[in-house]
A protein has these predicted regions:
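Short, charged, amphipathic alpha-helical segments
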Residues: 293-305, 328
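Conserved acid/base catalytic micro-environments in cytosolic active-site loops
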Residues: 1-286, 305-308, 313-323, 333-337
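Acidic, serine/threonine/proline-rich low-complexity intrinsically disordered regions
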Residues: 287-291
Length: 339
């Protein structure tokens, strides 16, 4: 008996509407299981209720060690990665990947390993490039790689990145996605040949060693924005990845965004501390004036200096910053983010 298909879907910004529209057109008794990761972080999620109201295929938040069944939609719950292991769903609070938990890549990797050619990976609308590495792994193991046409997506970066880095089987508008999935699970649609599982070429002398098929370089003079651990660079196909010893993982674009967030946090904290110093120095000036009028001068000067530097630093934080995202960098048109 042929093994049933498993469809793994990843979405981020704009994903609620996209998932609603996709699920609304799936038929009752859909002969496959659907596993969904939406970037929701630790926030409460009403996605299963939204999907249940949209169409006939039942949806629920996954539970740990739950058996996977056909005709069911499983949604990763808040603040947990969802993966597949031995036909069951596992929910893990392991380190964030691509600045997200739940993240798409862990699900896609596990589905690729567990289901091989019976896996179907779908990347929908979203920012940055979570899902690109995992979709490549699904393709490498003989599965089917699909993205929402970036021109059709509310936020084209995520499907665009997957399209740029993975040999896709299908790139379709969202309106065509339900019909395509029905054809695929019923075996009525063809697909391109999958990428080879391993390169048959011997490793050249001087080439970086590999771990699970990824080439690793020496540790970098960069630290993890999440925990401060040293980062190790690796390359999977055309995608550069950075991992720390704790397990936090980033693509290059996500690391750039995470670095910016951390930089802004530290600079705003410095502004706050400078303002606090200015206030403290004024209080000390008042105390000094009670004992010796001339003694207040240095404290007042220190307060003025702190306020002046807090202002300059705040102006710096609130200036426009270049944020070379995937497509902006590729096209030579870097985008800007204003403070």
């Amino acid at each position: 008996m042929a093994r049933s298909k498993v469809i793994a879907i990843g979405a981020s910004a704009g994903g609620v509407d996209a998932l609603h529209d996709l699920v609304a057109k799936l038929p009752e008794a859909f002969p496959a299981s659907v596993l969904i990761v939406l970037h929701i972080g630790a926030h409460r999620s009403e996605l299963p209720a939204i999907l249940n109201a949209a169409g006939p295929v039942p949806a629920k938040h996954a539970t740990n060690y739950e058996q996977i069944s056909s005709g069911q939609i499983y949604v990763a719950p808040p603040d947990h990665h969802m993966i597949v292991s031995h036909g069951r769903l596992r929910l893990l609070r392991t380190p964030k990947e691509n600045w997200a938990r739940p993240a798409i890549d862990p699900l896609f990797r596990s589905v690729a390993e567990a289901y091989g050619p019976n896996a179907i990976g779908v990347v929908l609308t979203g920012y940055l490039n979570d899902g690109s590495l995992g979709l490549g792994e699904i393709k490498r193991r003989g599965g089917i790689a699909i993205v929402q046409d970036p021109d059709d997506a509310a936020y084209p970066e995520m499907p665009g990145s997957a399209a740029a880095h993975v040999a896709l089987d299908y790139r379709v508008a969202l309106s065509r996605m339900p019909g395509l999935l029905v054809e695929l699970v019923n075996g009525k649609a063809g697909k391109e040949a999958a990428m080879p599982n391993k390169s048959s070429q011997p490793e050249a002398e001087g080439v970086s060693p590999t771990i699970d098929g990824e080439k690793f370089d020496r540790p970098l003079a960069l630290t993890c924005p999440e925990c401060g651990g040293a980062l190790l660079k690796s390359q999977n196909g055309t995608i550069i990845k950075f991992d720390c010893h704790i397990g936090h993982s980033y693509t290059g674009e996500v690391l750039a965004s995470a670095q910016f967030d951390e930089m802004e946090r530290v600079m705003r904290a410095a502004v706050r501390i400078l303002n606090e110093r200015a206030e403290f120095c004024l209080e000390m000036a008042e105390q000094a004036r009670l004992q010796e009028p001339d003694a207040a001068g240095p404290w007042e000067a220190a307060s003025k200096q702190a306020l002046d530097r807090a202002y300059k630093l705040r102006v710096l934080v609130e200036q426009d910053w270049l944020m070379p995202e995937t497509f902006g960098a590729m096209s030579g048109r870097p985008s800007r983010i204003s403070g």
